[in-house]
């Protein structure tokens, strides 16, 4: 029989109609000779009533066989429920069953198929197809589908062309590790799965496509955390002849449309803009969460003369003030914060409390000479807790930035209903890598340097600034973009600054350099992490919740057991050998 509608769509206007529904048995209850079934499908739950006086013996016998997660087909008439269930969208009606067929049986599931059930992450991933049956999960994927639909329509209406770029591409240095794919035909050679379509989308601008977009899978072999996966999806854009501001305007309009159509929220445009240096100095992060205060305060000059070497000899002394919560933090609690701070390079954490206008704590005695200045500078009041880090400016910023976020979450200071977007601009072109002992691209080596700082490519790389911009939401980097280099001599200077020899640059990027000899237009773009955007829209804290079949923190899939060993025959075809090290 053909399904009449989804179970979750049945309403009072359908009373009196005979309909056919199909779905899963969510729950079965026997009560006073009647059998009640909660039938679940993609759109919700509908109560079925099977009365032995209204059905044949065969139907009743079939009903008695039903267990959770059996797949069934039912026919019956829609009737008003005697006692409505306000918790269900279908709660005013029920289906009086006249026909019932079991389409498939089910084993007892390893966990209940309902929201809020306590199950380990690996168990959920092992039985992901069951986990995805839960209404909460289904809603997240409807939201994801709606988001991509809005994005496609918005960009289509602005004249963007959806172009697919290669999944098998060339491995290039810089950035995260590539996932490599051995070639059977060109033995000893490897493709790489793309970390982004960066170069190919730039080449599309050289081809005259003018406005490109793609919702594309990307791959990075990097350490995982809650908002990272080895394969992820991004909304990728590239444009020709547009300024930094014009690109940002397009992206803001897209985000505003997504927010309105998926959440019913009107966001204020334009988004605020914050210089990279201001973000680091005031928030301790290049992706600041502006939903709460507790900004970093620079006290380096104020405490320079105090008789406390930790402060007086430090390159930077910075602090955050936890307003009105000193009594929430015992000495033991602060010790935990200190150990946390050490994970980010700090040697320790100095602190004081304000009690009835006086400083208390282990460093209070060293600050008597500057107590009034500190009180005025930090606007201190009774029951304030002040946390200090004295170290390099980088360590002080990073440590206090992470402490700021941790404490705000601990004290429930963040309004989780708010969506705070902003642009972080005026980025440094390079960042120093302690591991590599050299400067590396803060974004990628195709980013255009500012006209004012480009001369420093042959001088002090720390002074080179980029025409780059990141879009941030609630402390998460949603995406990043920039204007790109379109002239060969500038691109060669960039490669040289990064330590490439001419031969290395030609070997890795010769095709791009050659393309720049054929009228490459000025261009720029941006990529937004779709998984991360949907995660935040859905109010989740891990992108696994909005990816259908994600990997765990070991980059493996407990369901399929990927990655897995392959046969010797497959290895021989690729002329590969596996060396086992004890």
Swiss-Prot record:
GO cellular component: cytoplasm
Gene3D superfamilies, per the entry: Bira Bifunctional Protein, Domain 2 (3.30.930.10), GAD-like domain (3.30.1360.30), Nucleic acid-binding proteins (2.40.50.140)
Protein origin, superkingdom: Bacteria
Catalysed reactions, semicolon-separated: tRNA(Asp) + L-aspartate + ATP = L-aspartyl-tRNA(Asp) + AMP + diphosphate
Binding site for L-aspartate: 174, 220, 443, 484
EC number: 6.1.1.12
Keyword Calcium appears in the UniProt entry: no
A GO BP entry: aspartyl-tRNA aminoacylation
HAMAP family reported in the protein's UniProt record: Asp_tRNA_synth_type1
NCBIfam families recorded: aspS_bact (TIGR00459), PRK00476.1 (NF001750)
Protein name: Aspartate--tRNA ligase
Gene: aspS
């Amino acid at each position: 029989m053909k399904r009449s509608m989804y179970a979750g769509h049945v309403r009072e206007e359908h009373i009196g109609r005979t309909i056919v529904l199909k779905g899963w048995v969510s729950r079965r209850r026997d009560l006073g000779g009647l059998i009640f079934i909660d039938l679940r499908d993609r759109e919700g739950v509908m109560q079925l009533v099977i009365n032995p006086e209204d059905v044949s013996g065969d139907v009743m016998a079939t009903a008695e066989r039903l267990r959770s997660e059996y797949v069934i087909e039912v026919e019956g008439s829609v009737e008003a429920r005697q006692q409505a269930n306000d918790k269900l969208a279908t709660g005013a009606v029920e289906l009086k069953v006249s026909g019932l067929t079991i389409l498939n049986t089910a084993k007892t599931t390893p966990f209940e198929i309902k929201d809020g059930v306590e199950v380990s992450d690996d168990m959920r991933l092992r039985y992901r197809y069951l986990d995805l049956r839960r209404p909460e999960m289904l809603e997240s994927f409807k939201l994801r589908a709606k988001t991509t639909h809005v994005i496609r329509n918005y960009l289509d209406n602005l004249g963007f062309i959806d172009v697919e770029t290669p999944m098998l591409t060339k491995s290039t240095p810089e950035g995260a590790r590539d996932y490599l794919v051995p070639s059977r035909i060109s033995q000893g050679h490897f493709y790489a799965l793309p970390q982004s379509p960066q170069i190919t989308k730039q080449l599309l601008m050289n081809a005259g496509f003018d406005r490109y977009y793609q919702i594309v899978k990307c791959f990075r072999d990097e350490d995982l955390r809650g908002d990272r996966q080895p394969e992820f999806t991004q909304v990728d854009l590239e444009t020709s002849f547009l300024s930094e501001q014009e690109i940002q305007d397009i992206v803001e309009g897209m985000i505003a449309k997504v927010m309105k159509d998926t959440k019913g929220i009107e966001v204020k445009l334009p988004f605020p803009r914050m210089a990279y240096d201001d973000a680091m100095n005031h928030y301790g992060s290049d992706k600041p969460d502006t939903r709460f205060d507790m900004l970093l305060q620079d006290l380096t000059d104020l405490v320079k003369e105090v008789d406390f070497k930790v402060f007086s000899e430090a390159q930077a002394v910075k602090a955050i003030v936890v307003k009105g919560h000193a009594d929430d933090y015992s000495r033991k609690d602060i010790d935990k914060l200190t150990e946390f701070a050490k994970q980010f390079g700090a040697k320790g954490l100095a602190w004081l409390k304000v009690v009835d206008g006086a400083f208390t704590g282990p460093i209070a005695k060293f600050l008597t000479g500057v107590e009034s200045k500190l009180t005025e500078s930090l606007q201190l009041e009774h029951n304030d807790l002040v946390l200090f880090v004295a170290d390099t400016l980088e360590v002080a910023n990073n440590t206090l930035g992470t402490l700021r976020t941790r404490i705000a979450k601990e004290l429930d200071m963040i309004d989780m209903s708010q969506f705070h977007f902003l642009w972080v601009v005026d980025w440094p072109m390079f960042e120093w890598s302690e591991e590599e002992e050299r400067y590396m691209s803060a974004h990628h080596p195709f980013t255009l340097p500012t006209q004012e700082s480009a001369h420093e490519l042959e001088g002090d790389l720390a002074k080179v600034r980029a025409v780059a911009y990141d879009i941030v939401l609630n402390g998460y980097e949603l995406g990043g973009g920039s204007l790109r280099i379109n002239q060969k001599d500038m691109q060669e200077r960039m490669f040289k600054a990064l330590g490439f020899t001419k031969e290395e640059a030609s070997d890795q990027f010769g095709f791009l350099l050659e393309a720049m000899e054929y009228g490459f237009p000025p261009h720029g773009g941006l990529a937004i992490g779709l998984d991360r955007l949907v995660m935040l829209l859905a109010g989740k804290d891990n992108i696994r919740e909005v990816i259908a079949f994600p990997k765990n923190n070991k980059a493996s899939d407990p369901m399929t057991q990927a990655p897995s060993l392959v046969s010797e025959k497959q290895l021989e075809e690729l002329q590969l050998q596996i060396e086992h090290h004890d």
